[in-house]
Amino acid sequence: VGLLVLGLAVGATGTAFGSTDLLTIGTLPVLLVVLGMLAVGVVDPGRGQGLRTRRTVQPDPVHVGRTADVQVEVGLARGASRARLTDLQLREQAAVELSGGRPLRATVAREPRAVRLRYPVQATRRGRWALGPLVVTRTDPFGVARVRATLGARETVTVWPSVVDLPVPRELLVAEPERSVVGARSPAPDDAALRDYRVGDDLRRVHWPSSARRGELVVRSDERAGMRPVTVLLDQPAPGDALEWCISLAASVALATHGAGHPTHLLTGTATDDPHAARLEAPGRQQLLDATVDLTGQPDAAAAEAALLAEIRGLDDADGGSGLVIAVLGPQGPAGRAALAGVSQTRPGWALVRGSADDENATATARQLRRAGWRVVQAEPGADLEATWWRLTGGAA
């Protein structure tokens, strides 16, 4: 723009004074600008279908704290001129949760009909984060005109919570039905995950107590027969570090029991929980982790309590009225404590209560759960996950 204004000013001066030389000098910058604009306009990267993009992310999803490798290819569409790739400058865009707020540094490889970018992203926060679109810039051969456009679509990278490998105490999870808890009756180990009755099912496989409770026939599933179902309850705190710690702990526990062969369900107290559907087919590793991606925490104690009570009401649908319950809890009020005490009347329960040793509400919650027959440890948010799990299992892993 400055060069164009300068040329017009010099040309106007030459015209005013009748100077052919000044007019010629003023015309040259204007011609350069016009030619440059025509040059970049002909091969404008944002116009038409001359360029195609393809972006791959490995791995996707990625865990918090891990690095993903991103590759972007900008290639010529069929019949497009190679001039579209000449002197093309590329810049990728990424959410701050993937870039850390720093410019992305990519390795660029140029070929006759394609340009490839490769760069790493560091997942710093759980969620779904934007990647792209690509920003492409072209400058004319004279360096006087520049065009900028976006290319390709915005894509989403899913970030799972950070998890740790936890050992599963087989002698506890499998032999637990033989252990009596205070005031509890423990179901047999063959009361594994249940599913709806289908025509042709052997009536000897009907689980009559659960059928009576639900008003419909359900049968014991053959899947992982003899392996005790495990349900992980997550009591979400308010957004913050405590929430991320609780989610990582609950996800790690769920993955550990699932990996040990136990039908495992993760109840998070959100509208996405569907215990009725969950009992038809135990979720796999990816489904367990996907259930944690969009969790945002509870706004207050009342909302957290209501969500936990809803989870407890859905327990029978999740595990068929049997199985081990592992709860990641915050300090509970009277209603929450009473509901959790009722859980231990029909199934064994383990609980990790969130709170420091001098947190009176957390200590009172842990004490009442122990009286009701729960196995309980109290841990402060941020504590080492493996050490916390080790304390809960008594080191029998």
Which ranges hold each PLM region?
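An amphipathic, basic-hydrophobic helix/alpha-beta surface used to engage anionic
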Residues: L35-R279
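Extracellular/lumenal glycan-associated context and N-glycosylation machinery
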Residues: V1-R54
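Acidic/proline-rich low-complexity IDRs
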Residues: G2-V5, P133, D165, Q368, ...
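Short, structured coil/loop segments at alpha-helix boundaries
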Residues: S19-L23, A83-L85, A95-V96, P112, ...
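Exposed, interaction-prone extracellular/peripheral surfaces
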Residues: S162, V199, L203-A397
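Intrinsically disordered, low-complexity regions
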Residues: T15, S19, T27, A80, ...
